[in-house]
Regions:
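A Rossmann-like FAD-binding core segment of flavoenzymes
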Residues: 72-88, 93, 170-259
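Residues on a specific face of well-ordered alpha-helices
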Residues: 41, 133-134, 138, 161, ...
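FAD-binding core/adjacent interface of flavoenzyme oxidoreductases
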Residues: 1-10, 64-150, 158, 170, ...
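Short, ordered loop/turn segments at secondary-structure junctions
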Residues: 35-38, 48, 84-85, 114-116, ...
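Hydrophobic/aromatic ligand-binding patch that stacks against planar heteroaromatic rings
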Residues: 18, 22-23, 35, 109, ...
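Generic domain-boundary/flexible-linker signal
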Residues: 41, 90, 120-121, 141, ...
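Beta1-alpha1 glycine-rich phosphate/pyrophosphate-binding loop at the start
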Residues: 5-63, 67, 71, 154, ...
């Protein structure tokens, strides 16, 4: 396959879908390339797949994601799902789709692959039952799978509380949230609050996630360090240091997010 477009977009998440839609609506020829079978990226993962509405923990995410995909499909942009780009040089892009190699040409390329959750090693991190928090959320969205209890979430950053909120809204109990964010980060962030108010909907969503955890009664340990996954053949316990004391919690699943 060899053809030239005005623009080629890599990544079918929110940014890639919007970019491809706007370009196509402007009358230009654009193709969107993505590794997944369905558009939506991570936040709207498989949002148009059968049964997605039941799997999504937040109705607003499902609504926003489906509308974004509908706009993209109405735009007339071309779409190459299950396609992996592995070479990019000037106006030439090589990609694989199944056993086929695609030779794609475009005058402009937009890379919208989003962020990638990084695995952070800690003691016991290779035990069965330990996984990235984002991976746990993907299993929920794509297959409706909930982690084995007791479930402990640990790490730092917004994704930690987003995953906690999703599990709580699905009625899935959490043993604890272990927040490793240093207290000093709150002071460092304070000067940016006025600018942050420009993104008020996102701030309100963050407060909603925190409120979900609070209302559920899930214990939250803050300024945590020294997290260790323990067990013989699989995860059995999580130990950590908090406020001068070593704590140990029974756990069958540890969802960790290190940024």
């Amino acid at each position: 396959m060899s053809r030239q477009w005005d623009a080629l977009v890599i990544g079918a998440g929110p940014a890639g879908l919007r970019a491809a839609s706007v370009i196509a609506e402007s009358g230009l020829e654009v193709v969107l390339v993505d590794e997944q079978a369905f558009p939506g990226g991570q936040i709207y993962r498989h949002v148009t797949a059968p049964g997605a509405e039941e799997r999504f923990a937040e109705a607003a995410d499902y609504r926003d994601g489906t509308e974004l995909v509908r706009r993209f499909r109405r735009s007339g942009a071309e779409y190459l799902p299950e396609t992996t780009v592995w070479f990019l040089e000037q106006d030439r892009i090589l990609a694989s789709r199944g056993e086929e190699v695609l030779d794609l040409r475009a005058r402009n390329v937009i890379i919208a692959v989003g962020a990638m959750e990084r695995p952070v090693p800690f003691r016991g991190w290779t035990l069965p039952g330990v996984m990235n928090a984002g991976a746990g959320d993907i299993l929920l969205k794509t297959a409706g799978l909930l982690p084995e209890t007791p479930v402990v979430l640990a790490g730092s950053g917004p994704l930690l509380y987003l995953v906690a909120s999703h599990l709580i809204r699905k009625g899935h109990p959490l043993a604890a949230v272990l927040d490793q964010t240093p207290p000093s980060n709150m002071l460092k962030a304070a000067p940016h609050l006025p600018a942050g108010l420009l993104g008020l909907p996102l701030l309100l969503r963050g407060l909603s996630m925190l409120n979900d955890v609070r209302k559920s009664g899930t214990p939250v340990y803050r300024d945590v360090s020294g997290i260790e996954a323990q067990g013989a053949d699989r995860l059995e316990r999580v130990s950590f240091f908090c406020k001068g004391t070593v704590h140990t919690l029974d756990a069958a699943t540890l969802l960790y997010h290190g940024g």
